[in-house]
Amino acid sequence: IEASKAFAKDLMQKYNIPTAKYRVFTDAPSACAYIDAEGAPIVVKADGLALGKGVVVAQTVEEAKAAVRAMIEDKTFGQSGARVVIEEYMEGPEVSVLSFTDGEALVPMVSSMDHKRALDGDKGPNTGGMGAVAPNPYYTKEIAAECMENIFLPTIRAMRAEGRPFRGCLYFGLMLTKSGPKVVEYNCRFGDPETQAVLPLLKSDLLTVMQATTNGTLADASVEFSTGSACCVVLASEGYPKKYESGFPITMSEEAAAHCYVAGAKKDGDTLLTAGGRVLGITAAAPTLRAAVEGAYRLAEGVDFANKYC
């Protein structure tokens, strides 16, 4: 359901789960002809796993066709791009909802908003995620009820009907369009960096909830979240998700270290070095969203490495 976007789209189409109109292609000329017919903006996705970088939101026909050729002909993402999904462009706020499910019951976690673009102002290429806030300010109780009825429960029922019952953490990437919530993608795991903003708000014991998920007793479990907000800011190597340098020493204050989630970094003796694009995340929780965001950026100032970008 995550490793093949074509599988996920076909599943949604078969079981009437709302999502964007799409077509699947394995050859560039056919895909480019479809793009010519549909026009832009349009979305091109590598079918397989691509570390969160296999999606191009093309603003022009030429940009979309270049993305298709890069994936299918140039094999930018190897076999993951041998097949591409071309989707209609959707507009609206994005929402991430992680959930616990034992295949029968489903319990959504507090909603979140992932910021995927590399630059401020929703600009730049897509990344694995440059930060997240929870809860999502656009996700109302009414929208949550609609998603439960039309998306969440139908998805786990569809997996059961296909003989592939899902048990674990199921992530719903949603867009709140004018015609209602629609699925952008599924992940069969905790999202990064959404998890770093969501789990600090969990009041219940995580191990107990996960045991209930694996044991098939989730319907009887207590899953509670606090009413506050949390913000995770990703500190990246400048240049990510394209070319960047690594191997720089990382220093941080004691307070920042207490709120730090290490990602693209490695130990060299007693020294922590950068070793990836998204180096680490800093999370702050507070009674309000504004206070959580301010707290996360204040903590991020306590972290330093040569090409830090956030």
For the regions a protein language model found, what residue spans apply to each?
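Conserved N-proximal alpha/beta basic substrate-recognition cap immediately N-terminal to
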Residues: I1-E38, I42-V43
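A structural signal for short, well-ordered beta-strand elements
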Residues: V24, V57, A285-A286
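Solvent-exposed alpha-helix faces
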Residues: D36, R69, L153, A296-R298
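Conserved anion/nucleotide-ligand pocket segment
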Residues: A40-V61, V198
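Internal nucleotide-binding/catalytic subdomain
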Residues: G54-T195
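Active-site "cap" helix and flanking loop/linker of ATP-utilizing ligase/carboxylase catalytic domains
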Residues: E146-L170, N187-A257
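Peripheral (often C-terminal) accessory segments that flank ATP-dependent C-N-forming ligase machineries
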Residues: A212-C310
